[in-house]
Amino acid sequence: MSRRTDSLCLDEYLSSELKKRTHILECAWNQEHDDDEEEEEVKVDQGSEETTSSHDIYGDVGKRAPNEFEKIDRLTTIKVYIAWLALFVFAHIREYVTRFGFVKDLSSKENAKMKDFVPLFSDFEAFYQRNCYIKVRDVFERPICSVPGATVDLVDRVSHDGNWTYEYPGTRTNVINVGSYNYLGFAQSAGPCAEQSASSIDREGLSCCTTVHERGRSVSQAKLEKLVAEFLGVEDAICFSMGFATNSMNAPCLVDKHSLIISDKYNHASLILGCRLSGASTKVFEHNDMESLERILRDAIAYGNPKTHRPYKKILIIVEGIYSMEGSICNLPGIIALKKKYQAYLYLDEAHSIGAMGKTGKGVVEYWGCDPKDVDILMGTFTKSFGAAGGYIAGSKRTVDHLRAASPTGYYSSPMSPPIAQQIYTSMSIIMGKDGTKDGAQRIERLARNSHYFRMKLKQNGFIVYGSNDSPVVPMLIYFPTMCGFYGREMLARNIGCVVVSFPATHMTEGRVRFCISAAHTKEQLDEVLETVNLLGSMSRSKFSKRSHLYKNQKIEW
């Protein structure tokens, strides 16, 4: 039977059988409403609160800001490739000149004592480290010596051997911080979070000095897990002391070699590692592309595992809420619809979206007006919006109990430090309004306002910005590898701390400056950053957008 005939048969089967047992979400991507239709209320599980209006700080649920990925012209793309080619050619020349002794450069030579050691990097990785990364190493790995709030103190350092080693004169520089994931501004050295975290040390100390299964977890962590489940509107939750391990070490507990993982193209490294460790078959769909996802789902059901020619026992879709390098928001309603249609499971990583998205900070599930029970595995981290460390997995009690018994990171690792658990508990309570104030709601609203203002101003100034206007992650494309060093150094010289990203973290032609907006930022601070970026963009001719005319006469309010 031909592939086309199989697909047609599958369509008939799905329409006659699966649709009888499942219903498709009413909230769909870019859903249109009739003029005479009354505005519908979207039900969201909020514990004691049953419903919320379909209109919030982001506008109507059915009219969310789309993800934008403006492309550059071919000529600029060719120029970027030529820049990389020139970089590699001169790097090879430098390697040969140094190797044959024409130029003395002891800093990049291997120590004779290390000749018998196993290489840490492949040949290309070592070559790239020696000749490309080392030239701009000074804009990365900058040590900080203060709380990473709206401003942060950077330790000054100088290098006399091409960034191989550093000297520290003992001074520091205070900069506007647009590089940390401090979305809601809870990274503070004073206030209720810091005070209650400090008091928890007196009660419970700094560590339990054991694993969860030997002596158990702290009272603070037990309280936190109950609060996380209440906050998300699910049955249960489990917390871990490391966010990266929450993904990488728990995925193998959910799937095995008889399962299929369908992963978004731009998923985080922790998810990719988890997929590899699980032993499951893995297929990648194009970023946020529902047609690509459905095509893989259809083929997986129609043909099964190509190695065994048997049906997969389980199909798990893995996506993120906000993608940290793209600034885009996942199309959750579309993904849930396909998940239900094809009887798959859904794993949602809300590391960057929990606390930062939604009317009450409950992530992209609330942002889209979806039911949290439609997501099988809700994952998130506490390193961003909560100003702490660690991660969580939430969902049904059966799933969480399975992880408590089978997860290596829960079984062998130490439980969460009590002051960290208390920091998360206090900040989450503020977000939920349990402190009796509106501080949490005001932080969420201020973050949304800051993010929209900053993004729109960059677009108005002629820069290409990826992602959604509602996202606090703002990637500004600069493309050329040399631009990363230029922006990193010039921004620091003007007392602004930002993150520049290039290959291998991104594609070779998509170098970028990534701004992370915070509720702690004032309009004056954002304007100062925008003024500096605009100046550097003019100096380096990195205003590549062809759509700036669409925003020229638009009044952008804060």
Curated annotation (Swiss-Prot):
State the UniProt keywords alphabetically.
Acyltransferase, Lipid metabolism, Pyridoxal phosphate, Sphingolipid metabolism, Transferase
What family is reported? Answer: Belongs to the class-II pyridoxal-phosphate-dependent aminotransferase family.
State a single Gene Ontology molecular function: pyridoxal phosphate binding
What are the GO cellular component annotations?
membrane; serine palmitoyltransferase complex
Instruction: Point to the regions of Acidic residues compositional bias.
Output: 33-42
> What does it do?
Component of the serine palmitoyltransferase (SPT) that catalyzes the first committed step in sphingolipid biosynthesis, which is the condensation of an acyl-CoA species and L-serine. The catalytic core is composed of a heterodimer of sptl-1 and sptl-2 or sptl-1 and sptl-3. Required for the specification of abicobasal polarity and development of the gut lumen.
Q: What is this protein called?
A: Serine palmitoyltransferase 2
Q: Which residue ranges are recorded for the region named Disordered?
A: 33-57
Q: Which reaction does it catalyse?
A: L-serine + hexadecanoyl-CoA + H(+) = 3-oxosphinganine + CO2 + CoA
By which gene is this protein encoded?
Answer: sptl-2
**Disulfide cross-links:** none
What's the Enzyme Commission number for this chain? 2.3.1.50
S-adenosyl-L-methionine as UniProt keyword: no
Q: Name one GO biological process term.
A: ceramide biosynthetic process
Oligomer and partners:
Heterodimer of sptl-1/sptl-2.
Short name of any one Pfam family annotated for the protein: Aminotran_1_2
Kindly tell me the pathway this chain contributes to: Lipid metabolism; sphingolipid metabolism
Q: Give the N6-(pyridoxal phosphate)lysine positions (modified residues).
A: K384
Cofactor(s) this protein cannot do without: pyridoxal 5'-phosphate
